Amino acid sequence: MKVLWAALLIALLAGCQGKMEQVVEPELEPEPELHQQADWQSGQPWELALGRFWDYLRWVQTLSEQVQEELLSSQVTQELTALMDETMKELKAYKSELEEQLSPVAEETRARLSKELQAAQARLGADMEDVRSRLAQYRSEVQAMLGQSTDELRARLTSHLRKLRTVSYTHLDVYKRQSLASQPLQERAQAWGERLRTRMEEVGSRTRDRLDEVKEQVEEVRAKLEEQAQQMRLQAEAFQARLKSWFEPLVEDMQRQWAGLVEKVQAAVGASAAPVPSDNH
């Protein structure tokens, strides 16, 4: 039974291939949002990831019979999911990088920008999720309406994708403007950091100069103290020499007088101790 349904589906798709190409070909014409997307592809990694997401969708739409087989399988949904995950990962990384660069900015401003970027990021994610759900819905409708015109289903999907792409690029433009709006804050924060760094360098330079001056003053005071100490030593030595010159004669005279006194005492003692002559001799 499944083989019969598959054969019937292939026959219907083969018969509608000519009409399908007429429906798809206008989609390949340049659109304003596609020009914007081409410009954005030279920007941030998250913009490149989102561009790959829409490039993949446009490639799917350019297929004829093969696209139906792909849509009836889960390959397209899985690949779109992978592209969505890649885009959201790049968005989160870009948001984290912005928050890190805005660290010197006031907490209130940083919180507001973070909230706005998170809201824009959520809208982009919702847009891509809507694309995936509509592809799943289209696949279900193809499976349920094999007896109806597949051209109508293709046209509906093409219209939905065109509208979703327009809305998505509108949200992307909002996200990009909000991210660019934070750049002046980043520049001001960098300028503020540069001024602070310059100010700290000036303060450090003045402090080093002041320390050098204090060091020179300390060296000068130390030299003066050493000079004064030397002068005091010389004065003390001179005073000691004068004292010595004053007292040496007096001491010598006292020593001579003491020596003379000792001699006299010794002579007196010696005379008194001499023996008296005897009458028997």
Curated annotation (Swiss-Prot):
The modification Phosphoserine is found at S149. APOE exists as multiple glycosylated and sialylated glycoforms within cells and in plasma. The extent of glycosylation and sialylation are tissue and context specific. Keywords: Chylomicron, Endosome, Extracellular matrix, HDL, Heparin-binding, Lipid transport, Lipid-binding, Oxidation, Phosphoprotein, Repeat, Secreted, Signal, Transport, VLDL. It comes from the Eukaryota. The modification Methionine sulfoxide is found at M145. One of its GO terms (cellular component) is synaptic cleft. Residues 160-170 are annotated as: LDL and other lipoprotein receptors binding. Residues 242-254 are annotated as: Specificity for association with VLDL. Its main location: secreted. PANTHER family: APOLIPOPROTEIN, APOLIPOPROTEIN E. Residues 82-219 are annotated as: 5 X 22 AA approximate tandem repeats. It holds the Pfam family Apolipoprotein. Sequence repeats lie at residues 82-103, 104-125, 126-147, 148-169, 198-219. Belongs to the apolipoprotein A1/A4/E family. Residues 1-18 form the signal peptide. APOE is an apolipoprotein, a protein associating with lipid particles, that mainly functions in lipoprotein-mediated lipid transport between organs via the plasma and interstitial fluids. APOE is a core component of plasma lipoproteins and is involved in their production, conversion and clearance. Apolipoproteins are amphipathic molecules that interact both with lipids of the lipoprotein particle core and the aqueous environment of the plasma. Residues 230-281 are annotated as: Homooligomerization. It is found in: Secreted; Secreted, Extracellular space; Secreted, Extracellular space, Extracellular matrix; Extracellular vesicle. Homotetramer. May interact with ABCA1; functionally associated with ABCA1 in the biogenesis of HDLs. May interact with APP/A4 amyloid-beta peptide; the interaction is extremely stable in vitro but its physiological significance is unclear. May interact with MAPT. May interact with MAP2. In the cerebrospinal fluid, interacts with secreted SORL1. Interacts with PMEL; this allows the loading of PMEL luminal fragment on ILVs to induce fibril nucleation. This is Apolipoprotein E. One of its GO terms (biological process) is positive regulation of lipoprotein transport. One of its GO terms (molecular function) is phospholipid binding. It comes from Aotus nancymaae. Heparin binds at L164, R165, T166, V167, G193, E194, R195, L196, R197, T198, R199, M200. InterPro entries: ApoA_E, Apolipoprotein_A1/A4/E.
